[in-house]
C-alpha cells in the first residue's frame, strides 16, 4: 500500500522520503523510498526525491549523525548500478567501494576523544578486544586504532543498512510491477569468478597499500552472496521458512556462521550449487 502510494508521482515520493528521513531512526525508510524511485525512473527523474531525503539527512549530519545521509547516498548509488547493470553483485561491489572511500576520507570518524567509545566496543565484543590488545602490544597508537575501529564499524553498519534498504526497495518494485521477481532475482544472486577476483585484488591492495577499509568491507558482497545461496537452496528444496529463521539467528549471534557463509559464497562462485541442484531436481 505504501509503495503504491509513493509511486503515484514524484511529489508523493519526495514528501514520503523527506518525512521519513526527518524522523529519528526512520532514515532507512527514506533511503528505501529514494532507492525505489531511482530503480523505477532512473537517477535524473528521481533527483527531487533524493534531494528531499538528503536535506533532512544533512541536518542530522550537522547534529553529529552522519549515518542517515551516508545511507541515502550509498543506497542511491547501488540503485543506479542495479538499474543499469541488472546485477546485484556489481551493485554490492560498488557499494562496498563507496563505503570504503567514506571510511578512508574520515566521514565516520567521531569528533573528540574516542577512547570511551573504544572501551564500550571492547566490552561488547571479545573478538574486538583481543584484536586491539594484540595491535597495542605491537606498538600501535590506541587513539588511531580507536578511530579506525569505530569508523570501520560505522561504515559496515551503513553498508549493511543500505543493502537492506535496496532489498526493500527492490521488493516493493517487484511487488508492484513484477510479482515474485525479487525472490527469483535474490535466489539467483552469485558472484562471477571475475567479480571474486576483483574483490581479492582489492583486499590485497588494501593490505599492501595501507588502505584498511578495502580489506574491512571487501568481504561484504561475498557474505550477501552466501546468504542468497542459503535462500536459494531452501527455496529449491521447498523447505520450511523456519530454517531461514534459525539461519539468521545463528548468523547474527555467532562468528563461525559468518565464516561458513563466506566460505559457501566463495565455493559457490566456482561450483554453482543452485544450478547443480536444479538439474538434479
Question: Across the structure, where does each feature detected by a protein language model lie?
Answer:
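Hydrophobic transmembrane alpha-helices
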Residues: 1-52, 238
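Membrane-interface interhelical loops and short interface/amphipathic helices
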Residues: 104-149
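Short helix-perturbing small/polar motifs within transmembrane alpha-helices
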Residues: 57-61, 68-110
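Transmembrane alpha-helical segments in integral membrane proteins
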Residues: 154-178
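Small-residue-rich helix-loop
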Residues: 175-229
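Long, positively charged, glycine-interspersed low-complexity recognition regions
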Residues: 216-281
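Hydrophobic core segments of alpha-helical transmembrane domains in multi-pass membrane proteins
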Residues: 29-35, 68-76, 212-223, 259-269
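Central hydrophobic cores of alpha-helical transmembrane segments
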Residues: 47-56, 91-100, 240-251
